[in-house]
């Protein structure tokens, strides 16, 4: 009788160990997937704009403005077949990795000097597999709509649409898990991964704008230049052309962490570099 009880206890122990092992395995797999999604960085998501389509996993995504609704229609084309995915997009640029698509939806109110004014603004995640929308954040009151310019799966980057197209204001970092928005109050156009930082530029404005480095979550902003009209990353350096308001320019560079700024040319008329 005692042996049977011991055998039963051993069997129960083995079952518990196996259950714990399976639990740890599934937890580890989930964590690995999340880490991999984040480690792909900003290159995992493609930016699609109303004037430039983009290809992700064999599908071409494009946008077209609907004058009647004051919104964009988002299309997907593959193997010669084109279909409308969304007709409620208010953002002039969106991002997708082929699984999810991020955009803002809002009701247009009126036009202004620096862009349209909207109400009922919402940041939305669209699941391309289930074709369902999920509202992540609802914004209060009237205001400008954000264009989405980048995403790494954990953080999403966007800025207020203006009349300049690629030039956007009040750059924001969205924590997708916590659904929190951090506004930096700076202009923006592009985002790019540089080592463990994010390089933000505002080169979409005709007069240029700030170039700066941030942590992925938007913290510790470091200004590289207050008015850069061209920015590129090559090898161990960030190269940028900065300008004055009377259109003198010079080409400069700095280390990938924003240190050791160096002018490569003297100030001159025209665009340096």
Task: Set out the residue ranges of the language-model regions.
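Bacterial N-terminal signal peptides that target proteins for export
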Residues: 3-16
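Bacterial N-terminal signal peptides
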Residues: 15-27
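Sec-dependent signal peptide cleavage junction
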Residues: 24-40
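Repeated scaffold domains used in trafficking and secretory/extracellular systems
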Residues: 45-55, 89-98, 141-152, 185-195, ...
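Residue position within the beta-strands of beta-propeller blades
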Residues: 60-64, 102-105, 156-160, 199-202, ...
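Structural motif
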Residues: 68-75, 109-124, 164-173, 206-213, ...
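Short loop/turn segments that connect beta-strands within beta-propeller blades
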Residues: 77-81, 127-131, 174-179, 215-219, ...
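Beta-propeller fold detector
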Residues: 83-88, 134-138, 182-186, 222-226, ...
